[in-house]
């Protein structure tokens, strides 16, 4: 009996069982840069806000139908954001105007809609670059380059 236990205990480490991952990630990046993925409609009225939200819902429905379980939602593009911030302005892709309030929180909406579908939503942030000189100028006084000059270095 002792010999059997000894042999089994010596062989046990060499027996391997292929384990499945606890959670498989099937993710898609959803970009807002230049409206490549979303949004197509500018949020300038109650109707266009509803349309902008419907566009996102449609994308999420298609991702869910394709068996995706994670969305990497772009929340910061080039020095502007897709959520209310006291540091940086709203992205102009939302309303057509840099800093223009779209009338809702796009990130909170994306999270809520992902969760309704049993999907995870991860914030994807582009940290650098802030953009070319023309883009940075379009951000106005709320730009990080204006407010925090000591941390920004122009590319030459």
Residue ranges of predicted features:
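Bacterial N-terminal signal peptides
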Residues: 4-13
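N-terminal signal peptide c-region/cleavage motif recognized by signal peptidases
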Residues: 13-14, 22
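Extracellular/periplasmic catalytic domains that process cell-envelope and extracellular macromolecules
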Residues: 19-24, 64-65, 115-116, 144-145
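Active-site-adjacent "subsite" loops/lids of carbohydrate-active enzymes
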Residues: 23, 31, 35-54, 112, ...
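Hydrophobic faces of well-ordered beta-strands that scaffold small-molecule active sites
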Residues: 26-30, 71-73, 121-123
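A mature extracytoplasmic/lumenal domain signature
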Residues: 32-34, 75-77, 87, 125-127
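Aromatic- and glycine-enriched glycan-recognition loops and surfaces
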Residues: 45-66, 93-117
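Aromatic-lined carbohydrate-binding/catalytic grooves of carbohydrate-active enzymes
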Residues: 66-102
């Amino acid at each position: 009996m002792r010999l059997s236990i000894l042999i089994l205990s010596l062989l046990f480490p060499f027996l391997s069982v292929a384990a499945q991952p606890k959670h498989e990630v099937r993710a898609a990046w959803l970009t807002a840069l230049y409206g490549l993925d979303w949004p197509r409609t500018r949020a300038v009225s109650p109707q266009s806000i509803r349309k902008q939200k419907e566009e996102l819902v449609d994308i999420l429905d298609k991702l869910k139908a394709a068996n995706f379980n994670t969305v990497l939602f772009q929340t910061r593009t080039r020095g502007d954001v897709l959520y209310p911030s006291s540091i940086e302005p709203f992205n102009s892709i939302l309303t057509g105007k840099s800093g223009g309030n779209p009338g809702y929180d796009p990130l909170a909406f994306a999270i809520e809609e992902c969760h309704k579908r049993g999907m995870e939503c991860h914030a994807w942030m582009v940290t650098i670059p802030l953009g070319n000189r023309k883009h940075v100028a379009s951000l106005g006084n709320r730009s990080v380059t204006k407010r925090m000059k000591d941390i920004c270095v122009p590319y030459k």
